[in-house]
Amino acid sequence: MSYPVFASNVPTAEGKCPTFADSRSAFVPTVSVIIPVRNRSEVIVRCLQSVAAQTYERVRLIVVDNGSTDDTRSRVADWMSANAGRFVETCLLDEPRSGANAARNRGLRAVTDGYVAFFDSDDEMSPDFLTQMLAALRKDAAAQWVLARTRMIFPDGTEQVRHGVPHPSAAHHLLSAQVSTQSFVAEANLLRAVGGWDETLTCWQDYELGFRLLRAAPRTAWCSSVFHRIYRTPDSITGASLSENAEGIVHVLRKLAEQVEKVPHFPPHTLDIQLNGGHFATPSSDFSPIAAGGFPKGAESSAQAVDGSPTVADSTSIAEHATAEQAQCRLALWLRVHIIAGQFRAEGASSTADALLSAVGALLRRVSWLDLVVARLLLAYSSQGGRGAWRFAALWTRLR
């Protein structure tokens, strides 16, 4: 395999990363791997080597130093200088604002094309990750992003594969937290369209981003393999218990409740997205994919429109679907909040549980009395240390 040669890992004057100088971009999309790092001198090279070992032929490695006070930045710079032109295109950026999300967004702003994968500086990427993920995307031309499962490694050496199902709904993600930082590859334009990472969050950032991605682009490709070595260390951001991060968790759930309760609306460009194979487009989109059968089930009649534009019937169908999806997400989040409140109580943080139920419950429209009973049962089960409550909640949400 031949690798492109590039002159420097220094960003351009516009703050963008340097691009490949060869002519393959039209045929092989670039995947930018964005890694935020702060004071990870002892593990960062291991992570970089795992990205360099990718079998995919067009990788751009973007490392964003987030104010390291040790020699992390110099180690990254030395590694990039030593490997320039050998493995992947590299770019080293700085983000003075604290927080991994600020660093991730800095990296995203530097990307001009292709796909993006995010990774953490203390983990190891599987060598065939990008090859398999892009292959899955090629099989589903209407999908803008692809999901897979990941493998977690605990301090005692035990391993656990994270939950994952093909093509999860936004409601399923609210209960299962399927979308995690290292589990997806997405079009850069899609990530920008949903607003990138929320820099106000201190935990569960991928949980919140995953929900926005699934609402904006519900059609996902699926890769059935299990990837990576994701190390769960004692200083993990989630801590030893949920209640240690209660304030941050409540903040995330409040944000999600606000998003769920937003009244669905469909400006012209959104209708284009829904009907044009799920891809983000402008109001002046070419609607030839629609004429080829790329519209929602039951909307075939719109192909007869004189100008190829979506019809009123299409708009009504989409609006009805969105309303049903909103109700499903509301129920899923309602149940998830009760499960987490039960976990808070199991940890002896009853006042925190009550505060969560009050803060988030007030933002969600009331569910049916039967759903309320189920939520109370899940709360009681979780407060006694019961595990796997989300699986029953997911089943109940589907049945409703």
Q: What residues fall within each predicted segment?
A:
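Catalytic core of nucleotide-sugar-dependent glycosyltransferases
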Residues: 172, 225-234, 239-266, 290-292, ...
